Design a protein with these regions (language model features):
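N-terminal cap/leader regions of alpha/beta-hydrolase-fold enzymes
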Residues: 1-134
Length: 134
């Protein structure tokens, strides 16, 4: 990325009813007291990876706190490999709504997340999940 905005970023584990969900989060650095509108990016079927982390960074650089959950955390993997279709088929809207509730709770407690409305972005398999959580 050219003209990079300085970001705070890293991995966090968010507790859900089904276990610890690893998420990558980023937000603008520089003002520790600033709060930013949240955006949740839901992964596509191949799972979380570098290009999706870069997407989170691009969103954050525009003035948001952006987060992407590893929706395959229940299986203990980031890259589903040959299990992708089985893992994809196993996901239900109920599971994703529960995961999203945990993300919202985490954001509500984060000092740099602005309370109120949030954005949701979904691709491929996660488009239907965004419709379920909104």
């Amino acid at each position: 990325m050219s003209n990079q905005t300085s970001l705070n970023e890293g991995f966090v584990n968010i507790t859900t009813p089904d276990g610890e969900m690893e998420c990558f989060v980023a937000w603008p650095a520089g003002d520790d007291t600033a709060a930013y509108p949240p955006v949740v990016l839901y992964m596509d079927a191949p799972g979380v990876r570098g290009e999706l982390y870069d997407f989170v960074r691009r969103i954050a650089a525009q003035g948001y706190i952006a987060i992407i959950p590893n929706l395959y955390y229940r299986y203990g993997v980031r890259d589903p490999g040959g299990q992708m279709m089985a893992m994809l088929d196993a996901h239900t809207n109920t599971m994703i709504i529960s995961d999203t509730r945990a993300i919202i709770d985490w954001l509500d407690a984060h000092p740099n997340a602005l309370p109120g409305p949030m954005g949701c972005i979904g691709y491929c398999m996660s488009g239907k999940f965004v419709l379920a959580v909104t």
